[in-house]
């Protein structure tokens, strides 16, 4: 485990983007596992800036996203497909057919979970997985006490997660209560993992995740066992 302390959010974003860009430059057809939420936005902005300067080419890159709300159309402004399009995909030259986000609208959600796992396997696995961390230690939408051995599955969102996401909706009652997410097992199978955390409110959970016991009550704690984990954090 490598822990990097950033001096600011912009420094965190540059450092994270540098790791991602190095992965793409060294292996243009890399499979990137991508995350949503407020923390990765600066990282994506930095990647877009470097792309516009001609420093990085995404034309052969493949992306797989961690999760999606159940019941939201891809065109819904709160869907994670929409988030990725607006914050990254439409600003770079990654082919749309190379971008994968699980569907929250599939008629058979269990089949969608199995198909998403098969997709990742057929792509040869994830080369670099980007992660944020929730206040309760969730990664993806793997809530506390979810089994570590799960692959892609449907989850009922915890109260703290719903409250945290309510700021993106006009009313807390509009926040979806279920999501499809890559499981802990799926995440741990990535060749490299990059965890980013920003803000003083993330300090306690990062300490629990990285230095506390490995337990399903803190989902991110399993990352202690990953053979190639980099953590970039800024608690300012």
Curated annotation (Swiss-Prot):
Q: GO: which molecular function terms? A: glucosamine-6-phosphate deaminase activity; identical protein binding
**Per UniProt, what is one Pfam family of this protein?**
Glucosamine_iso
Q: Which reaction does it catalyse?
A: alpha-D-glucosamine 6-phosphate + H2O = beta-D-fructose 6-phosphate + NH4(+)
Pathway the protein takes part in = Amino-sugar metabolism; N-acetylneuraminate degradation; D-fructose 6-phosphate from N-acetylneuraminate: step 5/5
Please name the PROSITE patterns in this protein's record.
GLC_GALNAC_ISOMERASE
Q: Which family does it belong to?
A: Belongs to the glucosamine/galactosamine-6-phosphate isomerase family. NagB subfamily.
Described function:
Catalyzes the reversible isomerization-deamination of glucosamine 6-phosphate (GlcN6P) to form fructose 6-phosphate (Fru6P) and ammonium ion.
NCBIfam families hit by this protein: nagB (TIGR00502)
Name of this chain's protein = Glucosamine-6-phosphate deaminase
* UniProt organism field: Lachnoclostridium phytofermentans (strain ATCC 700394 / DSM 18823 / ISDg) (Clostridium phytofermentans)
């Amino acid at each position: 485990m490598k822990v990097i302390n950033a001096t600011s959010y912009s420094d965190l974003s540059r450092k994270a983007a540098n790791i991602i860009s190095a992965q793409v430059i060294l292996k243009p057809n890399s499979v990137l596992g991508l995350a949503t939420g407020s923390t990765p936005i600066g990282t994506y902005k930095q990647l877009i800036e470097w792309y516009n300067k001609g420093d990085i080419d995404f034309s052969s890159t493949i992306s797989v996203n961690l999760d999606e709300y159940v019941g939201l159309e891809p065109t819904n402004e709160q869907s994670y497909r929409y988030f990725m399009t607006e914050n990254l995909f439409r600003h770079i030259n990654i082919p749309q057919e190379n971008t994968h986000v699980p569907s929250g609208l599939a008629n058979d959600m269990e089949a969608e979970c199995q198909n998403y796992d098969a997709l990742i396997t057929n792509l040869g696995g994830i080369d670099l997985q980007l992660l944020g961390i929730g206040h309760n230690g969730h990664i993806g939408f793997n809530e506390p006490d979810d089994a570590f051995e799960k692959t892609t599955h449907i989850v009922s969102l915890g109260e703290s997660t719903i409250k945290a996401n309510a700021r993106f909706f006009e009313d807390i009652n509009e926040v979806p209560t279920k999501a499809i997410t890559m499981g802990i097992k799926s995440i741990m199978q990535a060749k490299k993992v990059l965890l980013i955390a920003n803000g003083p409110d993330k300090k306690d959970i990062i300490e629990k995740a990285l230095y506390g016991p490995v337990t399903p009550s803190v989902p991110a704690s399993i990352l202690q066992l990953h053979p190639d984990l980099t953590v970039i954090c800024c608690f300012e």
